[in-house]
Amino acid sequence: MQNNGRPMTAIPGPSVMPDRVLQAMHQPAPDIYGGRLEAMTEVIVRDLKAVARTQHDVALYISNGHGVWEASLVNVINQGDKVLSLASGRFGSGWADVAKKLGADVQLLDYGVHEAFDAEQLAAILADDKEHKIKALTTTHVDTSSSIKYDIPQIRKILDDVGHPALLMVDCIASLGCDRFEMDAWGVDVMIAACQKGLMTPPGMAFIFFNEKAKQAHANLTQVSPYWDWHPRTNPQVFY
């Protein structure tokens, strides 16, 4: 498909970049030791938090979405921790697979590609976990492969109603910038996103948003990956 002579690829992502984004790329790389890049980063962080509707932290990575699947997990779980994963498509199950390869004890609830999660089943599983062995619940907001959108506030309500402290972790790679997402109002503890879909910029960057509860989980880790560690990315001693 073409519009005014420029090819338009109508796929979920990488999405078509606006002309002003393409024009902004036609400039030399900035001095990484100068103030311009640091000032730009401050604006990017501010605007990302506005899109995610959060007052909490965001860590920026040179990565694709699969990278922040891993990064988000290694910042909050130890090997052997139990993770409950909801999936209605290949990306929900893909995140679960990464958790499993990192050594987590993963329970995958796979609902196929035609249905969202079963609220009664989810509530029963969480209520049965009396010892709170489940440390995190992972899910997509929208799974690209199936287009199924999950009701994130409902998942938060289920967690709260049964009094379960598991971290609520949400993949918004396909939805951030396309649909409303209220990280703070919906009680999401960790959210991941990338730049090439709803944010309509070139592929290559991904983001983890996390709140105080997630910070506490991070503080309790026995080990964290030095590259993926979000702490130096949000509290740098120097900018480089």
State what each model feature region is:
Residues 1-34:
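N-terminal "arm"/small-domain region of PLP-dependent enzymes with the aminotransferase-like
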Residues 16-17, 196-240:
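Active-site C-terminal subdomain of aminotransferase-like
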Residues 24-71, 94-100:
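Conserved N-terminal alpha-helix of the aminotransferase class I/II PLP-enzyme fold
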Residues 77-93:
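Conserved PLP-anchoring active-site segment centered on the Schiff-base-forming lysine
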Residues 94-105, 112, 123:
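Active-site-proximal loop->helix
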Residues 117-176, 190, 198:
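Active-site phosphate-binding strand-loop segment of PLP-dependent enzymes
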Residues 184-196:
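Conserved active-site segment immediately N-terminal to the catalytic lysine
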